[in-house]
């Protein structure tokens, strides 16, 4: 089967392109819009798995993709967190922990790239990303887009777990930079 050599990059770009549509659906006061926004967020989140999987499996890894993929993840998660903070009752603490870690780690990754140190993505970091995206999917849908009474609470609990893992996984980047302090 022939795969377009840019497919992983197209998936990453699609993840970024989905952000304004997800935000728009959140501002439409309709359960259907909330369901559509949550579905679109889930699909955008799934591209995070497939872009990397396809790139590695078919040897389509590019410097552009390696640079853009983590940016797309942070944009998707960050924009949705900011949207939720502005328009819902989501707890600020796990959201701010996640945002702070993502900004710090982005800076540390840039520094580590300058000194030619690579920090591989751990299984725990992949679990963290999955839980962040799962929690945010639930919170985007929320009780306004579903008849499930405790859906917001479930989303918040998962978000707290993701925030805890966010701090733990961020430590590996600080550890890699320690000898440069």
Swiss-Prot record:
It catalyses: a CDP-1,2-diacyl-sn-glycerol + sn-glycerol 3-phosphate = a 1,2-diacyl-sn-glycero-3-phospho-(1'-sn-glycero-3'-phosphate) + CMP + H(+). Its EC number is 2.7.8.5. Disulfide bonds: none annotated. One of its GO terms (cellular component) is plasma membrane. GO terms for molecular function: CDP-diacylglycerol-glycerol-3-phosphate 3-phosphatidyltransferase activity. Coiled coil: none annotated. It is found in: Cell membrane. Pathway: Phospholipid metabolism; phosphatidylglycerol biosynthesis; phosphatidylglycerol from CDP-diacylglycerol: step 1/2. The keyword Acyltransferase does not apply. It is a multi-pass membrane protein. The chain crosses the membrane at residues 8-28, 35-55, 64-84, 148-168. Its main location: membrane. Keywords: Cell membrane, Lipid biosynthesis, Lipid metabolism, Membrane, Phospholipid biosynthesis, Phospholipid metabolism, Transferase, Transmembrane, Transmembrane helix. One of its GO terms (biological process) is phosphatidylglycerol biosynthetic process. This protein catalyzes the committed step to the synthesis of the acidic phospholipids. Belongs to the CDP-alcohol phosphatidyltransferase class-I family. This is CDP-diacylglycerol--glycerol-3-phosphate 3-phosphatidyltransferase. The lineage of its organism: Bacteria, Pseudomonadati, Pseudomonadota, Alphaproteobacteria, Rickettsiales.
């Amino acid at each position: 089967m022939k795969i377009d050599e840019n497919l992983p990059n197209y998936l990453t770009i699609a993840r970024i392109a989905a952000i304004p549509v997800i935000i728009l659906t959140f501002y439409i006061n309709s359960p259907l819009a909330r369901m559509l926004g949550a579905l679109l967020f889930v699909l955008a989140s799934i591209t995070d798995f497939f872009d990397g999987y396809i790139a590695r499996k078919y040897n389509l890894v590019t410097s552009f993709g390696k640079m853009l993929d983590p940016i797309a993840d942070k944009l998707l998660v960050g924009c949705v967190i900011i949207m939720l903070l502005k328009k819902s009752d989501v707890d600020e603490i796990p959201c701010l922990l996640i945002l702070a870690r993502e900004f710090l780690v982005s800076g540390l990754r840039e520094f580590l790239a300058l000194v030619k140190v690579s920090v591989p993505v751990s299984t725990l970091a992949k679990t963290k990303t999955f839980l962040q995206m799962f929690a945010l999917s639930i919170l985007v849908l929320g009780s306004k887009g579903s008849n499930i009474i405790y859906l917001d609470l479930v989303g918040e609990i998962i978000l707290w777990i993701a925030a805890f893992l966010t701090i733990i996984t961020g430590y590996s980047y600080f550890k890699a930079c320690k000898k440069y302090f």
